[in-house]
Amino acid sequence: MARVLITGGAGFIGSALGAHLAAKGHDLAVLDNLSFGRRHLAPVTDDRFHLADIRDREAVLRVMRAEQPDWVLHLAAIHFIPYCNQHPVEAADINIMGTTHVLDACAEVPSVKQVFVASTAAVYPIVDAAIDERHATGPVDIYGITKLATEKLASEHGLRTGMPTIIGRFFNAFGPNETNPHLIPEVQRQVLAGQRTLHLGNLDPKRDFIHTSDMAAAMEALLEQGINGIETFNIGRGIEYSVRDIVAAFERQLGEPLTIEVDPARVRKVERMHLLADVSKLKRTTGWEPKWGIDEGVRTLLAEDVPL
């Protein structure tokens, strides 16, 4: 089993990844500044939890030297698109400079054998078909721009140091313990608060939603392959759902109808109508298959105890 360090391991996707790896017997440590994450979500004891900010280069290096990981999975980032658009300097500082510090620390600690860097489908341009990893990039928001820079940094680092590097382009994650008000947790919050008239933004965009448990399994499967060089993979489910489809899934699990009212304040000025992953490369490389569908995921979310 590997010694693993997850940056952002107390966040939404990072905590699911940590739980998955810990259950598989990997030796886990977490670095997180808890600006969005929550300490209780990180499945590690206090001596393996490091309260640190990736913008602090020396702090990152201290943690890396203390933990001597085999694998580093870099998930720490600001990723809520409206927040990034409103705070572009902060987004760039964390997502770009923070990544530089993590990569530099990996290069200075000889134990590190593989690096996984979380990116996003937001690096792609607006298109109407499924996208594979060979498609040209063309982000249309601050988040995507910072993550494309992250990818370039990771690739340059891998070429310069010879470090095996995996770049994972995450599509739309859903699951328990969400820490940002994306679509599914926002519907969940309103429904659990007793609302049957939902206030949402644009109803027509379609997204490829993938459960965080499936994402965690995909990341582990990629690292277990022992990939050499620098490789990029889409991490999605390969099925797209509209906002209306998501609301319908909640209706099925509730057994009652929901009404939707469009809130103009929630409508994005620049909106992708489609975002769908071609995950052929991921499946071909690892044999991975997603296990969670929308209905199963929504059923568990309705049983979740969330702050309203």
State each model region's role:
Residues A129-A130, I142, L148, K152-D208, ...:
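NAD(P)-dependent short-chain dehydrogenase/reductase
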Residues L192-L308:
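C-terminal substrate-binding subdomain of Rossmann-fold SDR/epimerase-dehydratase oxidoreductases
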Residues I54, A136, G175, P205, ...:
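Residues that form or immediately flank small-molecule/cofactor binding pockets and catalytic motifs
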Residues E58, D70, P82, V89, ...:
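Residues in well-ordered alpha-helical elements
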Residues R38, I81, P125, G175, ...:
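Generic structural signal for helix capping and beta-alpha/helix-loop junctions
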